[in-house]
Design a protein with these regions (language model features):
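Short, low-complexity, Pro/Ser/Thr/Gly-rich segments in the mature regions of secreted, periplasmic
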Residues: 184-188
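Hydrophobic packing positions characteristic
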Residues: 7, 11-174, 189
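Divalent metal-coordination and catalytic microenvironments
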Residues: 181
Length: 189
């Protein structure tokens, strides 16, 4: 499809098509999420960008996501207070775009991500309540895929087997041709 200018964005240009003369802001700016409940449900955020507008909140910042389309895409909204990188469409401060997030300190990095030794490949997704998914290239029992709930229930799939725990003592292990329930209380070969 051919790109069509947004008719609601006439503020970017005069009626004759000439660019408006106002301060332009190019590049990325540090911001903070003030509101993540978008009334239009489009993944927009209200942010504060001190280097551009001081303490005044921006208009709704459009998301820049890796995949988006009709009934498909990736949605991951940061919490209020999170650090976000903000750009401005054609440099116009009235049209912010949130393009990603950053951690303000090492204490903010998800705990599951810290379980992977530095230098080894892993991808971690973790919610604020500690529900998480880790995909790791670590060899053996510490690698593979791990789903973990906030209460400790886990599902681990790796080269050594499949391990399911409910976080309350029950466990199911599938290793080779053997199924073990509750640490050997029942073994099926």
């Amino acid at each position: 499809p051919e790109f069509q200018p947004d008719p609601q964005r006439s503020d970017l240009h005069h009626a004759n098509g000439a660019r408006m003369s106002q301060q332009r802001y190019y590049g990325k700016y540090r911001g903070m999420v003030l509101n993540n409940i978008d009334p239009m449900q489009q993944g927009r955020l209200q942010v504060q960008v001190p280097d551009v507008a001081g303490l005044v909140p921006t208009s709704w910042a459009m998301p820049c996501v890796p995949v988006a389309g009709i009934q498909n895409g990736m949605v991951a909204l940061p919490m209020i207070g999170s650090g976000v990188w903000v750009e401005f469409e054609q440099g116009n401060p009235d049209h912010p775009i949130w393009v990603g997030c950053f951690w303000g300190s090492a204490a903010e990095i998800p705990a599951l991500a810290l379980a992977t030794p530095p230098g080894l490949s892993a991808i971690t997704f973790q919610t604020p309540l500690q529900n998480g998914l880790t995909i790791s290239d670590l060899p053996g029992p510490t690698g593979g895929i791990m789903l973990k709930s906030a209460t400790g229930a886990t599902l681990i799939v790796n080269d050594t087997g499949i391990y399911i725990q409910n976080g309350k003592g029950a466990m199911l292990t599938l290793v080779g041709p053997t199924v073990t329930i509750n640490n050997g209380a029942l073994t099926v070969i």
